[in-house]
From Swiss-Prot:
High-level lineage: Bacteria, Bacillati, Actinomycetota, Actinomycetes, Mycobacteriales
Entry keyword annotation includes Isomerase: no
Residues passing through the membrane, by range: none
Function: Required for maintaining the appropriate mycolic acid composition and permeability of the envelope on its exposure to acidic pH. Upon expression in E.coli functions weakly as a triacylglycerol synthase, making triacylglycerol (TG) from diolein and long-chain fatty acyl-CoA. Has no wax synthase activity.
Name recorded for this polypeptide: Putative diacyglycerol O-acyltransferase Rv3087
Pathway: Glycerolipid metabolism; triacylglycerol biosynthesis
Knockout consequences: Inactivation of the mymA operon causes altered cell wall structure, reduced contents and altered composition of mycolic acids along with the accumulation of saturated C24 and C26 fatty acids, and enhanced susceptibility to antibiotics, detergents and acidic pH. Also impairs ability to survive in macrophages.
Catalytic activity: an acyl-CoA + a 1,2-diacyl-sn-glycerol = a triacyl-sn-glycerol + CoA; di-(9Z)-octadecenoylglycerol + (9Z)-octadecenoyl-CoA = 1,2,3-tri-(9Z-octadecenoyl)-glycerol + CoA
Organism: Mycobacterium tuberculosis (strain ATCC 25618 / H37Rv)
Length: 472
């Protein structure tokens, strides 16, 4: 038994209706790296052999009686791999457009809460003979950094690693209501002990937020009590999604970063802002003010994590979609990102995780339902959700099949119906765009806007580069 922390539990509480809080993980395999090629029975066997390497795959959640504490993870004695691993063929010709349309259908369904909260679709028929593993993994299990650890456990470092031998598994029966109630009462003192320090941290945060709010300059970060400017992405969720993805050369992103003296994350945020600006211009409503993005920030380093979970928090950053000039936009983005880092360092002891850890389940669930009823008017996640996760630098393998590409994105929410996430993998900078189908009819337009913004910055960087820099 392991109890969910506050953020883990929040991800469950936010579920419901058309809000799906599962994340999307896509690994595209190249079977040509195996002399025997692709085999569905072999893939099924690998999942069977490797399930024990990811203990979360066998964990289901159980609520705490009377809502006295957050839910718990327990091993599922009825775990059935075939209920989680499915097989499907991508419509011809198996290009990225057909694949992404299939992913939209796969994603837009809630996971079965009576089972472990994940599902993998093995998608055959991609162009070039490739195969994709499309995994829905509930955000309650892990944040992006934790998923990196899962990747390291599930995939090989080399194609020649010895087969994994699964040990015997005998899960205990599900705990009774009485047991779960006893565990909640046992854990209650430690929970109560966190109240005083958290209240002090919240009080300090309120003071800091007020100091930030006194200055309307965009060099200070947006705060929770500041409403984001209204836009087309701030609406309630429908049941359908739109999805697109594309790989960019990581070397080009690094070139822009190095030459223009900013971080890779600055480049990413500036390109997101450029993409949103182009999209809104085509919609006839160009932004006249800075927008606000919700951005996850790491709290606990990977080395200090005892088990998978959500150890990250979130803060807000100005998205400078109001600036037309790409270099001015990048400079303003750099200042905004630095301000957000400083703000988070001062307020992280009173972040969403610390507060949610103490609030009763029924209160949080009630607030989540109210946010859904009002179509996200609580303005919790502002205009856009963005994330940039540095992934593996070396290729990974499933058996002898090389992982050719890796894509990942988080969920969207009532009031924040657009998510743009990038994961780097080897020499790739892999972008996903996930949106509500009513809020954004065509995510390929946003992806194209990101590409155009990247090309603008790359051209500007190369125009400024010295001959020595261009040679390297």
């Amino acid at each position: 038994m392991r109890r969910l922390n506050g953020v883990d539990a929040l991800m469950l509480y936010l579920d419901g209706g058309s809000a799906y809080n599962h994340t999307l993980k896509i690994s595209v395999l190249d079977p040509s790296t195996d002399p025997d090629g692709w085999s569905w029975p072999k893939a099924r066997q690998m999942f069977e052999e490797r399930a024990h390497l990811l203990p979360v795959f066998r964990l289901r959640y159980l609520p705490t009686p009377l809502g006295l504490h957050h839910p718990i993870w327990v091993e599922d004695p009825e775990f059935d791999l075939d209920a989680h691993v499915r097989r499907v063929v991508c419509p011809a010709p198996g290009g990225m457009a057909e694949f992404c349309a299939l992913v939209e259908q796969i994603y837009a369904h809630p996971l079965d809460r009576d089972r472990p909260l994940w599902q993998t679709w093995v998608v055959e028929g991609l162009d070039g003979g490739r195969v994709a593993l499309v995994t829905l993994l509930h955000h309650a299990y892990s944040d992006g950094v934790g998923v990196l650890d899962m990747l390291a456990a599930f995939y090989n470092d080399t194609p020649d690693e010895a087969p994994v031998v699964a040990p015997p598994w005998e899960p205990p029966p599900l705990p009774s209501t009485r047991q779960r109630l006893g565990w909640a009462l046992r854990d209650l003192p430690s929970r109560l002990g966190k109240i005083a320090p958290t209240v002090r941290a919240v009080r300090d945060r309120v003071r800091i937020e007020r100091e930030f709010a006194k200055d309307g300059d965009r060099r200070v970060p947006p705060t929770f009590d500041r409403s984001a400017p209204p836009g087309p992405f701030q609406r309630g969720l429908s049941r359908s999604r739109r999805f697109s993805c594309e790989s960019f050369p990581l070397a080009e992103v690094r070139e822009v970063s190095k030459t223009l003296g900013v971080t890779i994350n600055d480049v990413f945020l500036a390109c997101v802002a450029g993409a949103v600006r182009r999209y809104l211009e085509r919609c006839g409503s160009p932004p006249t003010d800075a927008m606000v993005a919700t951005m996850p920030l790491a709290v606990t380093p990977a080395a200090e994590r005892a088990h998978p979970g959500n150890y990250s928090s979130v803060d807000y950053v100005w998205l400078r979609a109001d600036i037309a000039d790409p270099l001015e936009r990048l400079h303003a983005t750099h200042l905004a990102a630095e301000a957000t880092k400083q703000h988070f360092a001062q307020t992280k002891d009173a972040d969403v995780g610390a507060v949610v850890e103490l609030l009763p389940e029924r209160l949080i669930s009630g607030l989540a339902r109210a946010n859904a009823r009002t179509k996200g008017r609580f303005d919790t996640f502002k205009n856009v959700v963005v994330s940039n996760v540095p992934g593996p630098r070396e290729p990974r393998y499933l058996g002898r099949w090389r992982v050719d590409q890796w894509f990942s994105t988080g969920q969207i929410s009532h009031g924040a119906t657009l998510n743009m996430t990038v994961w780097s993998y080897c020499d790739q900078f892999n972008l996903c765009v996930m949106a509500d189908a009513v809020a954004v009819r065509n995510t390929w337009e946003l992806l194209g806007g990101f590409r155009a913004s990247h090309e603008e910055l790359l051209a500007a960087a190369r125009a400024q580069a010295t001959p020595k820099e261009m040679a390297t």
